[in-house]
Amino acid sequence: MKVILQLIVLTILVGCKPSAEKSKEYSWALLPFEKADEVNPVLLPDTNSTFLCPVRNTIVQWEEKDVFNPAAVVRNDTVFLLFRAEDSIGKFAGTSRIGLAWSTDGLHFKKHPVPVLYPDNDSAKIYEWEGGCEDPRIVEDENGTYYMTYTAYDGDKARLLIATSKDLYHWTKHGHVFKNDTAEVNKWSKSGAIVCKYQNGKAIAVKIDGRYAMYWGDTDIFVAASDDLINWTVLKDDKGNTTIFGPRPKKFDSDLVEPGPPAMLTDKGIVLIYNSRNV
């Protein structure tokens, strides 16, 4: 997987519209981005949406507090958003669940009435309760199965988990992405962006050197490899280092770097869009 280190190209969004002289230099960078202010926001919290929480065994207003951090995927000419939503109760004043919305134009969305992935009385509860299920990122394999990485938060640590679905409505949880590494299971981990290729409007997970690759982390950015998109191994260089890149002093990303949507394998390398924070 050394090719990962050789191919990586980073999308650094310094502005929405690069100057003409910069356009050629950043031709790989998917720029410019333009906000559709006339329709924003495309989703809002809803105090009328209710859901029977299986852990609390009571009705909760599952998206009353906020809706944010979505992942987008196209299925049957329809744009689907998997989004994080929070109620406003409990010791954290909110448990996160993942909802589903859809649109035929990518701008105007309708919501499914209940969350599609949430804390339950299952094997993932130890990681998910009661902070919840957060920040989905989604790709598809060549057989039409969707793989969603998401963050589980138990109130102490965030952990990176994965689930699969054939229809985006019904999900099977597969637990921690690093479940075969006890040391990693007990560490803070989140934000898994699996490397994919865009084919016919779909984000299809792609192998590099015979294995799938995923960028993850929210202090520094790391990379992991997998044979099946479910069980992942953290990669290290020849010196045992795991960091691909980290914050840069005195820059816009001086305090935090975190993978955004799935990384894209292009003819110019791997394009990774990441979010950041400065201090």
Give residue ranges: language-model regions.
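Sec-dependent signal peptide recognition
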Residues: 1-10
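Hydrophobic h-region of N-terminal signal peptides that target proteins for export
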Residues: 9-17
